[in-house]
């Protein structure tokens, strides 16, 4: 997301205002037809080229007010396209600069870089040595350090004696000189791009067109047209100066626009120069991995050939283990969750009691108590009331008889009801246990979905960790992780704050500092797209980033915007 897009639309609106003020928008005119093609703020190069070609035809006739508005809008489009190109190239330079700076963090990275670049260095040694022998018949430069380290300057090489060439210290020192030199030159080229970025962004956000639009209503047609012509000429000349064009006096403004658009289809000269200082190619960086992989494959082939039977059994065992894991711990639990959702609780697989067990035992207890009361109590007792009391757990009649029989336990055990009352209480105990189990059973059935979900959670977590590891380390080597994006965001925010702090005394930014600030802000906007922010938080963050980029209110306001990001988004970045 380009944070300057809104300001660009304001520029277009001011050009439209200039056109509307003088009423030169006749629908039948060819000029107005060309003007209508510039309504979009996102034209392709092909569309813009067609418009410029038509403007060249208009340049041969009388130049009315709308003609200069068309030129202004074309130049504004080219400002955007040039700014996009410079930001993209600066981003690539910054990525390569970050690579060289990461090598300087530890000795392991330097040694690894030396190993990765060894084939290229060997190629330079062979080529330069053969050239030296064939042309000069000089054998003394075969092992010269300049052949092994072609990017290190001569003064750096002379700092080390020849007999220390093969020592580890001198090699690491030369490596350090090389990658620091690459980083230094990339930083210089990026700063040159930053100057152009600052100039373009300041022009897009300037009020020059707005002032011309506001003053055109107070002037006559000739004076207002002269003001607009001056603004448009400045915009077009700025494009040619930033591209380093050599303009002939015979070339018209549409010709300059055409040349500018044609140059935008090719990388800039600074980018071509920066390619010599880019990080090594993917093949050069990964050839140790490829070599180790091929060697491992060859050794594995030898081992497989010698131990074919045992390896086959091992593979079969791993395959069956993976299949069983998927079937028993992923597929079946997931299907069980769906069955739990669709099934009735009465059909639940989690149960402690059979469905009719408690009911039958309760009915048996009621019959035993009613029979006992009928046999031992006088007539006239309400048996339905006794049945209800038994269902509620009240065995008063049985317990009274039991207490009476305990007075003469031996006699009542032989000829009384002691044994009968004991058996009734035993049945009561069984019913009480089943009632408790029934309560636990209902609780388990109510939480069956929770148990099923908890049961499958470890398997899903295990699969998620494996898939994420494979995705992060095998398939997405060139994609920044979320943690890396947040780190790059914090680094860019720190760099933006340093730029503003250094310019705090002057309360303004020069073109290079402002361009670096714009670059860092756009980098933060790109990094924030995949940091896991919600839509509302992302919109608020982009507004604050736009406040950092805007220089309308001074450096202090920009620093407050940086502090606001630190304060409000510290948990998100």
Curated annotation (Swiss-Prot):
Keywords for this protein: Membrane, Mitochondrion, Transmembrane, Transmembrane helix
Give a yes or no for keyword rRNA-binding in this entry.
no
Q: What's one GO BP annotation on this UniProt entry?
A: mitochondrial mRNA processing
Q: Does the keyword Transmembrane apply?
A: yes
Highest taxon above the source species? Eukaryota
The record's Gene Ontology cellular component field reads: mitochondrial outer membrane; mitochondrion
Membrane disposition: Multi-pass membrane protein
Give the InterPro entries listed for this entry.
NCA2
**Subcellular compartments:** Mitochondrion membrane
**Spans traversing the lipid bilayer:** 447-467, 513-533
What family name appears in the similarity comment? Answer: Belongs to the NCA2 family.
Q: What role does this protein play?
A: Involved in the mitochondrial expression of subunits 6 and 8 of the F0-F1 ATP synthase.
Q: What is this protein called?
A: Nuclear control of ATPase protein 2
Species of origin reads Schizosaccharomyces pombe (strain 972 / ATCC 24843) (Fission yeast)
Tell me the lineage of the source organism.
Eukaryota, Fungi, Dikarya, Ascomycota, Taphrinomycotina
């Amino acid at each position: 997301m380009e944070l300057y897009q809104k300001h660009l639309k304001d520029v277009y609106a001011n050009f439209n205002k200039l056109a509307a003020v003088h009423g030169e928008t006749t629908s039948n005119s060819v000029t107005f037809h060309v003007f209508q093609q510039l309504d979009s703020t996102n034209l392709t190069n092909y569309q813009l080229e067609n418009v410029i070609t038509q403007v060249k035809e208009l340049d041969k006739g009388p130049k009315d007010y709308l003609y200069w508005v068309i030129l202004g809008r074309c130049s504004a489009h080219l400002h955007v396209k040039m700014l996009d190109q410079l930001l993209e190239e600066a981003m690539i330079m910054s990525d390569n600069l970050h690579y060289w700076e990461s090598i300087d963090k530890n000795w392991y990275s330097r040694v690894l870089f030396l190993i990765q670049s060894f084939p290229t260095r060997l190629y330079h040694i062979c080529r330069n040595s053969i050239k030296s022998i064939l042309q000069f018949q000089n054998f003394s430069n075969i092992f010269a350090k300049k052949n092994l380290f072609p990017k290190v300057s001569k003064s750096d090489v002379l700092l080390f004696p020849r007999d220390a060439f093969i020592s580890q210290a001198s090699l690491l020192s030369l490596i350090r000189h090389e990658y620091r030199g690459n980083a230094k030159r990339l930083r210089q080229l990026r700063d040159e791009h930053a100057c152009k970025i600052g100039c373009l962004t300041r022009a897009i956000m300037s009020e020059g067109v707005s002032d011309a639009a506001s003053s055109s209503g107070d002037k006559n047609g000739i004076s207002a047209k002269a003001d607009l012509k001056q603004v448009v000429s400045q915009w077009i000349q700025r494009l040619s100066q930033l591209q380093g064009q050599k303009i002939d006096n015979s070339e018209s403004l549409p010709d300059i626009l055409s040349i500018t658009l044609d140059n935008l289809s090719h990388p800039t000269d600074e980018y071509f120069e920066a390619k010599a200082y880019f990080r090594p190619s993917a093949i050069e960086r990964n050839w140790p991995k490829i070599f180790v992989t091929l060697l491992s494959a060859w050794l594995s082939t030898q081992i497989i050939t010698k131990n074919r039977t045992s390896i086959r059994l091992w593979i079969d065992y791993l395959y069956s283990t993976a299949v069983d894991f998927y079937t028993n711990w992923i597929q079946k639990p997931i299907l069980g969750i769906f069955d739990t959702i669709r099934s009735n609780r009465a059909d639940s697989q989690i149960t402690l009691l059979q469905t009719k067990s408690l009911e039958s035992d309760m009915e048996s207890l009621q019959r035993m108590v009613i029979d006992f009361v009928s046999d031992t109590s006088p007539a006239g007792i309400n048996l339905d009331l006794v049945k209800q009391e038994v269902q509620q757990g009240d065995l008063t009649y049985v317990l009274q008889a039991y207490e009476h029989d305990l007075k003469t336990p031996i006699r009542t055990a032989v000829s009384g009801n002691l044994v009968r009352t004991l058996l009734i209480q035993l049945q009561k105990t069984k019913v009480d246990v089943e009632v408790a189990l029934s309560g636990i059973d209902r609780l388990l059935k109510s939480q069956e979905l929770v148990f099923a979900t908890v049961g499958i959670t470890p398997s899903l977590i295990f699969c998620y960790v494996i898939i994420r590891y494979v995705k992060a380390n095998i398939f997405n080597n060139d994609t920044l992780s979320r943690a890396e994006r947040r780190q790059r965001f914090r680094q860019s925010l720190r760099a933006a704050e340093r730029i503003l702090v250094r310019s705090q005394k002057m309360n303004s930014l020069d073109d290079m500092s402002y361009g670096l600030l714009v670059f860092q802000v756009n980098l933060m906007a790109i990094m924030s797209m995949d940091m896991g922010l919600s839509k509302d938080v992302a919109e608020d963050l982009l507004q604050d980033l736009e406040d950092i980029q805007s220089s309308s209110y001074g450096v202090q306001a920009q620093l407050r915007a940086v502090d606001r990001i630190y304060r409000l988004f510290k948990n998100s970045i």
